[in-house]
Amino acid sequence: MTDTTNNEAPRLDLSDVEHRVGKLVGGGQLWEPCAKSDIRRWVMAMDYVNPIHWDQKFASQTKFGDIVAPQSMAVALDYGHGCQPACVGRIPGSHLIFGGEEWWWYGTHIRPGDRLVQERRFAGYKVTDTKFAGPTMFSNGDTIHRNQHGNLVAKARSTAIRYLAAEAEKRGFDFVDV
């Protein structure tokens, strides 16, 4: 919420954010297991050329014995593509920009038939005064990806950037027409 009627500095109303720090957040889980066609479509979309991900004959001759997904497939098997745990709480008058992710993989490959399950947690936030929009919140969320056997596949930390839209517009950064 922006209140500058009394020459006060604009503030983010974080009352619906603060109590969520460190807590698990909900989110959907995919119903269907990963299929070979899902892996093939993902590698085509990402333009991966390694035949271990799409060529049945080639993959059968490798140590895996079958097609395996590239590590990045974990994001495609997550509801919300990993950003969701960083985007919690209502901040009146704010806009959100996805700020990216960092990933760590643990050697468990995603195979056809696997079901990934995610545990999501709002890790925390910091507020920084920016030239762009004044008070701007950088929030982080963590997602742990496990397969149906409980094996750790990947961890991801996502960042969301939230700012007061009216303050950004006042400062000349209006993204409505972009």
Where are these regions (language model features)?
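Hot-dog-fold acyl-thioester-processing enzymes
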Residues: 2-100, 171-178
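HotDog/MaoC-like acyl-thioester-processing domains
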Residues: 1-18, 100, 105-178
